[in-house]
Amino acid sequence: MPLSQTAVASVLTCGPGNDFYTTFGHSAIRICDTAQGIDLVYNYGTFDFDTPHFYWKFMRGQLDYMLGRSSFNGFMEEYIYYGRAVWEQRLHLSPQEVNNLYLMLEWNYQPENRYYHYDFFRDNCATRIRDMVRLSLGHTDTLIADYEGPVRTYRRWVTHELEGTLEWWRLGIDLLFGLPADHRCTDVESMFLPIVMHDIYAGTYPKGTDGPIVDESVQLLPEKRAPLSRSFPPVVVFALVFVAVALLTWKRKMPCWADRTLFILAGLLGLALLFMWFGTDHYCTEWNLNILWASPLLILIAIRLERSPKWALWLQEGCFAVAAVWVVWCGLSMALLPLILTLVLRVGVLLKN
C-alpha cells in the first residue's frame, strides 16, 4: 500500500550507552504517515540470540544481522529506560522518494531478505541506512557531502570515541585491528559511525539542488545516563611494568621464569591475532602488524632463552623496531610502546649473553 502525500522519512541517531557494544551509538529509519496511522522504525542492528553457536559465530565474524521493525513508541522505550539521547533528522524527500524508501524497507523486511552479513566498517546499522537513503533518490551517487570535519582512518574514528574514558577498550581495539583499519576514509565511508553520519547528513544535499537533505533536526530525548568514570590509563600500567623490568635487568635479578612468562604471554597473544586474521571473516583484523612484536617466535625463545639462535633474536629485535614505527605512525595506543620496549630489553639481554 503506497504512503500518503504527507508521509515523512527521518534518520534517528541514538547516543552511546554505558555498555561497550553501545559505545558507538545506533542509527535507524523512521517512516511516519499520520494519515494512514503508520509510525514505524526500521533497525538494521538486531540479531538472534537463539542462533546455533551464537558466540562462536560472533567471534568469527559469521553472525548474520537482520533488519528489525517496530513501532516508534516501542523503539523509544529502550532509550528512555537507559537514558540515552536520540536525535531525529527529517529528510527532504519528495512523496515519491519517501514511498520508494518505504517500499524498499518493507521488501528488505521480508523473512527471506532481512538477514545480512555484518561488517563493522563497511556494512552495519549506519551504512545500510546511508545506502537505502541514496537508493531512494534513484541511484547511489545522488548525494554530495559538504562536510568540513576531520579526515580520519577507520581506526582513528573508532578510537576517538574511546579516548579518555575507555582507554583499555581502545588498547584492545588497537591490538585487534590490522592494516585495513588504517585506510583514510572518504565522507561516505566515515558514515559507518552513527554520530558521524548524523553530522555529515547535516551538511549533505542531493545533487542538482541547493537545499540540504535534512529539513529539520530535533533532539527527541536528552542524555540522562550516568557519565562513565575514567579508567586508570593502561599506558601508566605498562610504563610501570617497563620500569620494574628495567630495574631488575640493571640489578641482574630478572628471574628466568619471568622472562619465560613474558615471552609466552606475548607469543600466545600473537597466536590469537593470527587466528583473528586467518580463522575469521573479520576484514578489519587482517594484516595485523601487532604480530611483529607479539610474535609466536617468542614462544620458541621462551623455551630456549640463552640457547636461542642469534638469528632468531636479531629477527625478533628487527620486528620490534618495525612494530614500534607502525604504532607511532598510525596513532595506536601509546600503551603499546612500553610493552614493546619491555620485550626489546629482555630479548636484547639474551643477545648480549
Model-derived features with residue positions:
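A general structural signal for short secondary-structure boundary/capping elements
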Residues: 74-78, 90, 136
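Glycine-rich catalytic cores of cysteine/serine-nucleophile enzymes that process amide/ester linkages
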Residues: 5-83
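Second-shell loop/turn segments in exported
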Residues: 17-18, 84-92, 111-120
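Activation targets extended, charge/polar-rich intrinsically disordered C-terminal tails
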Residues: 107-294, 298, 309-313, 320-353
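Extracellular structured ligand-interaction cores
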Residues: 26, 39, 88-90, 126
